[in-house]
Swiss-Prot record:
Keywords: Cell membrane, Membrane, NAD, Quinone, Translocase, Transmembrane, Transmembrane helix. It holds the Pfam family Proton_antipo_M. One of its GO terms (cellular component) is plasma membrane. PANTHER family: NADH-UBIQUINONE OXIDOREDUCTASE CHAIN 4 (PTHR43507:SF1). Its main location: membrane. NDH-1 shuttles electrons from NADH, via FMN and iron-sulfur (Fe-S) centers, to quinones in the respiratory chain. Couples the redox reaction to proton translocation (for every two electrons transferred, four hydrogen ions are translocated across the cytoplasmic membrane), and thus conserves the redox energy in a proton gradient. Belongs to the complex I subunit 4 family. This is NADH-quinone oxidoreductase subunit M. The chain crosses the membrane at residues 1-21, 36-56, 63-83, 86-106, 113-133, 136-156, 177-197, 220-240, 255-275, 288-308, 317-337, 343-363, 389-409, 423-443, 470-490. GO terms for biological process: ATP synthesis coupled electron transport; electron transport coupled proton transport.
Length: 508
């Protein structure tokens, strides 16, 4: 019963927060905090129990925990939840960043507090559902459900720039996100239905169960078409070039607290879905199209890095750098290499933590000087306590300096791709020079240089509370632990990632 509890706690907690929306703001906060604390505890229980479970084989059907009850039996749909070590890692990442989101929201949300936590918890609940669903219809339901609360968080609590035209505001950006998400959902639904129908034609069994569908027999043309449909649905939400235009706008005008979930967790569901569904369901077509998709990964890396050089909005800059780093992970996924797979997971987790920290810091900068415009900043190192120092630290971490999880992830990706994709590795390494230049310019413009006279009143202003300070220290410690002792993730993720790699052993 751990899995149903894990997915239901955020939804139930969000509903309770909504009930107390107009009564007591503190009650809503403590309900949200309690809900995420329970999710975190359950995630840790799953992790420790999974480590102690001896799996007899590394087949793709080996789940550490599983829960299944019939739902719509006529169409072969069941409420099928299951986790292996890969999904448990993602659950722990979700619970950690969920707790960070709730902690950081204390006294920062001023209106409709209960409704805010309702949207936040339902977003987190949907993400948890995505990570533990192995019935494709149930997965699709959670995939679509994650869009609505995120959309309303953007509409009601997003940043409103009254000096810009209507198409540069939170409502337009939210609508753009919604449209892209609906296109992604539509393509995913159509591709799923074609896969289910194909399985029914060949095996005369109507089912949405992942464990059954991965054995579907089909010709290579049909498999390629369905695989590309799944890939397109997930690529829109990663996002990769050319499906990326919604992300910078969304980050720019979304609430800082909401960005932690969107950038830190929600976008990573697509990476997880590629590894969980795209590769095991369509191994032959994955191998055929791997080089083309890796080429898109290279384009994404360079495009994100180059465009970020010309950004003057701190949140838009972080968004483009995030897009660039997603290119590295995409290359790792389609390299068909065990070491690169593990590097992708380490990079995914570490980068989620460091990006969440940078977005939170951008909120602190805005609270201090009431602007996200980098060109209007400068000399903040002597004006603000702690914030410039943390900006420098997490920007350097994003460069992938040794001793951090980001470095280990990138190094393993390059090492895994080196033998079979040497040119890809060389181009990727050159892109790191651009990313380093971006990060250094980012820190220099904000923290150093001439002091803007309009910020003289900020001298020694301390906008960072003890709680905020401890959160940044906590995120920093996690990244350093992963960097100094990556076996924490490597050992846990080895079995499921080895299963994915072994799918190709019969025909590569």
């Amino acid at each position: 019963m751990l899995l149903p509890m894990l997915v239901s706690i955020p939804f139930f907690g969000g509903f309770l927060c909504l009930l107390f929306n107009q009564k007591n703001a503190k009650i809503s906060y403590y309900l949200a905090l309690t809900s995420m604390a329970l999710v975190f505890i359950l995630s840790l229980i799953l992790l420790f129990n999974t480590i102690n479970v001896i799996v007899s084989s590394i087949s793709n059907s080996s789940w550490s925990f599983e829960y299944i009850v019939p739902w719509i039996e006529k169409f072969g749909i069941s409420f099928h939840l299951a986790v292996d070590r890969l999904s448990i890692l993602m659950l722990n990442l979700t619970s950690i960043l969920g707790l960070v989101s709730v902690f950081c929201s204390w006294k920062k949300v001023q209106k409709n507090i209960g409704l805010f936590y309702f949207g936040l918890l339902w977003t987190l609940g949907s993400i948890i559902g995505i990570f533990i669903s192995v019935d494709l219809f149930l997965f699709f339901c959670f995939w679509e459900l994650s869009v609505l609360p995120t959309y309303f968080l953007m509409i009601m609590w997003g940043y409103k720039d009254n000096d810009r035209k209507f198409y540069y505001n939170n409502i337009f950006s939210a609508n753009k996100f919604f449209i892209y998400s609906q296109i992604s959902g539509l393509v995913l639904l159509l591709s799923t239905l074609v896969l289910v129908y194909t399985h029914y034609i060949y095996d005369h069994i109507l089912t949405f169960d992942y464990d059954v569908l991965k054995h579907t027999s089909m010709n290579i043309v049909l498999e390629s078409c369905i695989m590309l449909g799944f890939f397109l649905a997930f690529a829109i939400k990663i996002p990769i070039v050319p499906f990326h235009s919604w992300l910078p706008d969304f980050h720019c005008y979304s609430p800082v607290i909401g960005v932690v979930d969107i950038s830190g967790i929600l976008l990573k569901t697509s990476i997880y879905a590629l590894m969980r569904f795209n590769i095991p369901l369509f191994p032959h077509s994955t191998e055929i199209f791997s080089s083309i998709i890796m080429f898109f990964g290279i384009i994404t890396i360079f495009y994100g890095a180059i465009v970020s050089l010309f950004q003057n909005n701190i949140k838009r800059f972080i968004a483009y750098v995030s897009i660039s780093h997603m290119g590295f992970i995409l290359i790792a996924i389609y390299s068909i290499n065990q070491v690169a797979y593990q590097g992708a997971i380490i990079q995914l987790i570490s980068y989620s933590l460091s990006t969440a920290a940078l977005f939170l810091l951008s909120g602190h900068v805005f609270k201090s000087i009431s602007t996200f415009d980098i060109d209007k900043m400068g000399g903040l190192w002597s004006k603000l306590r702690w914030i410039p120092g943390f900006l420098l630290i997490f920007s350097i971490i994003n460069l992938g300096v040794p001793g951090t999880g980001n470095f280990v992830g990138e190094f393993m990706i390059f090492m895994g791709c080196f033998n079979s994709h040497l040119m890809i590795v060389i181009l990727s390494i050159f892109s790191l020079i651009l990313l380093a230049l971006c990060s250094l310019m980012f820190v220099q413009k904000i923290c150093f240089g001439p002091i803007n006279n309009r910020y003289d009143f900020l001298c020694d202003l301390n906008v960072m509370t003890i709680c905020d300070f401890l959160i940044f220290v906590f995120l920093l410690v996690l990244i350093l632990i992963i960097g100094l002792y990556p076996n924490i993730i490597i050992d846990v993720s080895y079995s499921p990632l080895c299963s994915i790699r072994n799918i190709f052993s019969n025909f590569i």
